């Protein structure tokens, strides 16, 4: 009887763990979608509120799209990995008259009769897929962190003069409430409201009370976009990438199936993200040195 109860409890815990992992993946997908949507909202609000350039909007939207779904499928990466290897293979064909010619891209006879070549090719393809994913991750890291840091530095070094369209006629009361219409002087203002580029006019979006408060809000938007994009990058390119990140195991047994809301969706250690990128750079340097020495 005790053996039956212990077996039933073991089967129940295994079933709960399986359902728990399925619920966890579902929550992870929802988390990625929500972070991606939040990033698009912040990028759009910054463009609308502070009249950022269209190129800034397009660049950040492209980066946001790439880090939301960073890697192609393994099947596509495997085709890319085997493309160069197939081009380097040559096969020998015998023409009438006994003349032999090598054809590039043709399987050699030694590959056709070697049973171990398939397993070796599989290992080589897996290594190539991991290498390509790490190269993609390194590129997106610079697009996510380096590009956002560049925008922040440029925003601090070159602040926006929000009162330039007023031509020195700054109001003394609580903000520019009754600025003349742009249809008479074309100063880029409409009753104190900003007129953005690309035929965009936000009704009710007034000028800030001072240049300091306006530029401070812009810097806060820049940091918010940086935090959201770097968190999304850490989630999609490190934690959920199945490359070199090992999620810490739970000390307590999984007694829940995830439907009670007790689910640890993901742990996002930002310091391990930096370590993973630095390790990718060291591995690439070692591979280049090894290839040069050969």
UniProtKB/Swiss-Prot annotation:
Reported function: Component of the Golgi/endosome-localized DSC E3 ubiquitin ligase complex involved in the targeting of the DSC complex to the Golgi apparatus and endosome membranes via the AP3 pathway to ubiquinate Golgi/endosome membrane proteins. Competes with VLD1 to determine the subcellular localizations of the DSC complex. May be required for cell cycle progression.
Keyword set, alphabetical order: Cell cycle, Endosome, Golgi apparatus, Membrane, Transmembrane, Transmembrane helix
Quaternary structure note: Component of the Golgi/endosome-localized DSC E3 ligase complex composed of at least TUL1, DSC2, DSC3, UBX3, CDC48 and GLD1.
Keyword Transmembrane: yes
Induction comment: Expression is regulated by the metabolic and meiotic transcriptional regulator UME6.
Protein's recorded name: Golgi/endosome-localized DSC protein 1
Topological domains annotated Cytoplasmic: 1-139, 237-294
Topological relation to the membrane, as annotated: Multi-pass membrane protein
Subcellular location: Golgi apparatus membrane; Endosome membrane
Topology feature Extracellular, residues: 161-215
Residues annotated as transmembrane: 140-160, 216-236
GO cellular component: endoplasmic reticulum; endosome membrane; Golgi membrane
Any Gene Ontology biological process: protein-containing complex localization
Superkingdom of this protein's organism: Eukaryota
Lineage, uppermost ranks: Eukaryota, Fungi, Dikarya, Ascomycota, Saccharomycotina
């Amino acid at each position: 009887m005790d053996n039956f109860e212990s077996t039933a409890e073991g089967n129940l815990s295994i079933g709960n763990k399986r359902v728990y992992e399925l619920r966890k993946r579902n929550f992870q997908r929802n988390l990625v979608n929500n972070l991606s949507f939040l990033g698009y909202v912040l990028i759009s609000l910054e463009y609308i509120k502070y009249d950022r350039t269209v190129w800034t909007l397009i660049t950040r939207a492209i980066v946001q799209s790439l880090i939301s779904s960073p890697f192609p499928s393994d099947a596509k990466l495997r085709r890319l990995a085997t493309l160069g290897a197939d081009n380097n293979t040559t096969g020998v064909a015998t023409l009438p008259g006994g003349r032999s010619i090598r054809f590039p891209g043709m399987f050699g006879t030694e590959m056709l009769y070697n049973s171990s070549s398939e397993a070796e090719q599989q290992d080589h393809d897996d290594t190539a897929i991991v290498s390509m994913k790490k190269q993609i991750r390194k590129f997106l890291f610079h697009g996510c962190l380096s590009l956002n840091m560049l925008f922040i530095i440029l925003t601090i070094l070159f602040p926006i003069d929000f009162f330039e369209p007023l031509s020195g006629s700054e109001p003394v009361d609580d903000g520019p409430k009754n600025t003349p219409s742009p249809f008479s002087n074309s100063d880029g203002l409409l009753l104190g409201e900003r007129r953005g580029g690309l035929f965009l006019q936000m009704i009710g979006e007034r000028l800030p009370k001072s240049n300091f408060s306006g530029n401070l809000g812009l810097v806060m938007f820049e940091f918010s976009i940086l935090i959201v994009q770097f968190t999304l990058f850490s989630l999609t390119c490190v934690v959920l990438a199945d490359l070199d990140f090992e999620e810490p195991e739970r000390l307590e047994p999984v007694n829940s199936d995830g439907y009670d809301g007790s689910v640890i969706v993901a742990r996002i250690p930002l310091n391990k993200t930096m370590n993973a990128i630095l390790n990718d750079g060291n591995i690439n340097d070692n591979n280049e040195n090894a290839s040069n020495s050969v």
